[in-house]
Amino acid sequence: MPPLIVVTAASSNHFGALVQMLGSLRRLNARVECYDIGLTAGEAGALPRWNGCVHHTFDYPRYPPHLNVNVNAGEYAWKPVIVADVVERIRSAANPDDARCDVLWADAGCFFHALEPVAERIASGEGVWVRTSAGTMRQWTHPGMFDYLRVSLDEYGGKRNADATLVGFAVGSAPASRADAIYRDIIQPWKACALAKDCIAPAGSSRANHRQDQAVLSYLVHKAGYAFAADTRDRLGVRCKCDRWFYTYIGFHFPAPLYARCCLY
């Protein structure tokens, strides 16, 4: 299997889902970088741990205040910043084993039955593995983001949205020139937009008309010319959107096989 690091993050409202996802990854002995973006001390201490899992506490003082997850979910701006943090460490790694790792961002609501299929798809693709989400960019991107980036809504408005739930970056397995392009064309500008509130969350935007990190990722994927993947959960062995609303009322304590059956896709 191509070496892969799974990256994720959660605050208290996704603690239960994170425990389930980390449990699934521990059973696969996966390499994981897990970021605490707002867990209580008790929750952080209760997370599954194993040798391949590195736990980080997100360093909020280093970043603009709009990343605060307690205010409008931090505009989801912490996600591109975390992805860039991991990718930049891989790019500068002295250890060859670390430098060969690809990166898979996975929202805390994902659940893994396998790693090899998605690792193979990332390594064998064009450099960025990403699927589509519902609707078009015109429907789910506030015009202020296009204004900030100085690009035409007409040029991108009819294009499909990218799904930022599960995104793979072949930064370790790709040839150096392609890995550089992934960083230059996707990772770096995704982070730059996330750090600028007028870009990732322009005035007048909300979850009713904008998809923050996903909106700018969609633009960058289209601009760079990456193709969307069509892989299903059956092929990948990864389920997404397992953090369904009813778990808020009934809890996340179900056995893993039952929990995984309730994932959206």
Where are these regions (language model features)?
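Glycosyltransferase catalytic domains, chiefly GT-A lineage
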Residues: 1-265
